Design a protein with these regions (language model features):
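Juxtamembrane extracytoplasmic/periplasmic/luminal helical "stalk" adjacent to the first N-terminal
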Residues: 1-4, 17-20, 132
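Short, solvent-exposed loop/turn and secondary-structure capping segments
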Residues: 33-38
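Short N-terminal helix-loop-first-beta-strand/juxtamembrane motif that initiates sensory/input modules
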Residues: 12-30, 43-93, 105-108, 112-116, ...
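Residue-level signal for functionally critical sites in structured catalytic/ligand-binding pockets
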Residues: 6, 18-21, 27, 122-126, ...
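Solvent-exposed, extracytoplasmic
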Residues: 5-10, 149-173
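Polar/charged alpha-helical tracts
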Residues: 8, 12, 142-145
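Extracytoplasmic/periplasmic ligand-binding sensor regions of membrane-associated signaling proteins
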Residues: 67-153, 159-161
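Charge-enriched interaction surfaces
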Residues: 39-41, 129
Length: 173
């Protein structure tokens, strides 16, 4: 029910900000104790052409991971590598691990914004060749309980390449 309740808001935010993707992953465990392959509930919605025209029925969007019941209730298409949950892989999950675990282990809890994290390098979701840069921050309850992350994805190529002035990014001394 919670994922269904937030799915339309995630789509709205993704469209409004012209993002390639948006996701929420729920977790209440110490990730240092989680083995690779551990699954966490969540949703990842992707738009391969955020600058292009979009369908009122969201036919231009796909779900990278989400429970099957959410796929049925939203009517969104599934990606070819769709999974019913997020599969944790420590070496490829900094977008989850760093903001979540840092907030979880903090002696003095700060605002979720203070734990925000941009990935340093693009990464790929399992069985998907498209690389993504991501920004994520932990989800924190008023009592300090850290229960997951919310984040955005930006396709690194060609979407970001078309947005960034590469001639201005060159370091020539």
């Amino acid at each position: 029910p919670l994922l269904r309740a937030i799915s339309s808001e995630l789509v709205f935010e993704m469209r409004a900000k012209k993002l390639s993707g948006i996701y929420v992953i729920f977790c209440s465990r110490d990730l240092d104790d989680c083995a690779d392959g551990t699954r966490f509930p969540g949703i990842y919605v992707r738009d391969l052409d955020p600058d292009g025209p979009y369908s009122d029925r969201n036919a231009d969007l796909s779900l990278e991971f989400a429970p099957a019941t959410l796929v049925q209730s939203t009517g969104l298409y599934t990606a070819s590598a769709w999974q019913p949950a997020f599969e944790y892989q420590r070496e490829a999950s900094d977008f989850l691990y760093l903001p979540y675990q840092t907030a979880r282990n903090a002696k003095t809890l700060l605002s979720a914004d203070d734990y925000g994290h941009w990935t340093r390098f693009p990464f790929c979701l399992p069985d998907d060749p498209r690389s993504v840069f991501s920004y994520s921050q932990p989800l924190i309850l008023p009592d300090g309980t850290v229960y997951g992350v919310v984040g955005i994805g930006l396709l690194s190529d060609p979407y970001l390449r078309g947005k960034l002035p590469t001639n201005e990014l060159q370091n020539e001394g």
